[in-house]
Amino acid sequence: MVEEKKEELVGKITHYFGKIEVGIVEITKGSLTVGDTIHIKGSATDFEQSVDSMQIEHQQVEKVKKGDVIGLKVKEKVKEGDEVYKIVE
C-alpha cells in the first residue's frame, strides 16, 4: 500500500528572480531546514524538490522559521502567490 505524503504549509512565494532561479519565500508557519523536501504548488506550478540553498539578506542559512523572508534556489519557475509545503515523513 502506498502511504500518502503529509504536507505542511510553511510559506508562500512573494517574488521570483528568473535569471538566478531564486524564489523569495515568506515563511508563515513552522520552519524549514536545508535537506527538507518541499512541494511548491500554484495555478501553473506543481513540483517537489529538496531544499539545497537558503539565504537571508545574502547570508547562507541552514534553518528558517516563521516570520523569516528567504531566498530559495528553485529548480523550476515559480510565481507570486504559489504555496510552499514541507513534506513530512
Task: List PLM regions with ranges.
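Beta-strand/loop-dominated core regions that host nucleotide or nucleotide-derived cofactor-binding catalytic loops
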Residues: 2-32, 36-89
